[in-house]
Regions:
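Short cytoplasmic-facing helical segments at TM-TM junctions of multi-pass membrane proteins
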Residues: 111-135, 221
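Hydrophobic alpha-helical transmembrane segments that constitute the membrane-spanning cores
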Residues: 52-55, 99, 136-165, 198, ...
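Membrane-interfacial helix-loop-helix connectors in multipass membrane proteins
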Residues: 63-87, 154-197, 205-224, 246-248
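Active-site cofactor/substrate anionic-group-binding motifs, chiefly glycine-
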Residues: 41-94, 98
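Short, membrane-interfacial amphipathic segments enriched in basic
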Residues: 1-32, 210, 215
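Selective transmembrane-helix segments that form parts of the transport pathway or gating/packing helices
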Residues: 42, 46, 50, 90, ...
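Membrane-interface helix starts
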Residues: 25-51
């Protein structure tokens, strides 16, 4: 029963994506909605990304210094491990998990409300491809802005680590700088950005599917928002394993 239901949901998702990825009929209207979605989904999320990244970067640096530093290890190890954790996992995977809660529920509730208030039906009656009109700008908008959020997250996390060095005196700024620069591999930054593009697609497309497919009333809209966040989070973790293996 569970397998058959999952296959049906999987098929409906691909059918919706087939309708979504078509050439927009009115490019000017599409660009207007595309820019609006970039602002609503991405720019409005910058503050929470910066706040979380700053404090997580500080906490990681403190934990690394306290728990793995020893007289037999170089003093720059804390800075090195902080950089690797921020670049490889936190700024892409964990940050996208956090954004799936904010952005995913936003998308699902918006489209779900439009469905139960028959706004999507009105678009269909007017001959508009509602999936393309409503969903495609969200997917492309989030995929466009997500790499910038990853870069901001990495930079802010490192600033948080410097905060512990200058204010908390956990380690010297010189040792932290030496660790941040040690054996730096630029590919790790590109890998983080590539992973974030996949995660942005998962968040926007899955949340759009659950919101667009709502049947019922306001209770079902809330349930769709919850299902969208849960499913997006699971798929992000699942795909992170394969993307890390492929890109490493």
């Amino acid at each position: 029963m569970f397998i058959s239901k999952s296959l049906v949901t999987f098929g409906r998702y691909f059918m919706l994506m087939g309708r979504t990825f078509s050439i927009p009929e009115r490019m000017r209207m599409f660009m207007k909605r595309y820019i609006k979605e970039m602002s609503q989904l991405g720019v409005d999320s910058i503050l929470i990304v910066l706040l979380i990244s700053f404090f997580i970067g500080a906490v990681i640096c403190i934990q690394m210094k306290i728990n793995i530093q020893s007289p037999w290890m170089p003093r720059w190890v804390s800075g090195y491990t902080t950089r690797e954790i921020m670049l490889l996992e936190f700024s892409s995977s964990i940050m996208c998990l956090i954004l799936s809660g904010k952005v995913g529920s936003n998308i699902a509730s918006e489209l779900g409300t439009m469905r139960v208030t028959q706004q999507i039906d009105a678009l269909e009656i007017m001959g508009v491809n509602s999936a393309n009109y409503l969903i495609l700008p969200k997917i492309l908008g989030l995929m466009t802005i997500m790499p910038f959020l990853v870069i901001f997250s990495s930079a802010t996390g490192i600033l948080g680590a410097y905060g512990t060095a200058y204010i908390g005196h956990i380690l010297t700024p010189e040792d932290l700088t030496l660790g941040l620069q040690h054996s730096f591999n630029p590919w790790f930054m590109y890998m983080s950005i590539i992973k974030s593009l996949f995660f942005a697609f998962i968040i926007s497309s899955v949340s759009s599917f659950y919101g667009y497919s709502v049947e019922g009333g306001s209770v079902e809209v809330g349930k769709a928002s919850t299902d969208a966040v849960v499913c997006s989070s699971v798929l992000i973790l699942f795909s992170d394993v394969f993307l890390t293996q492929i890109l490493s």
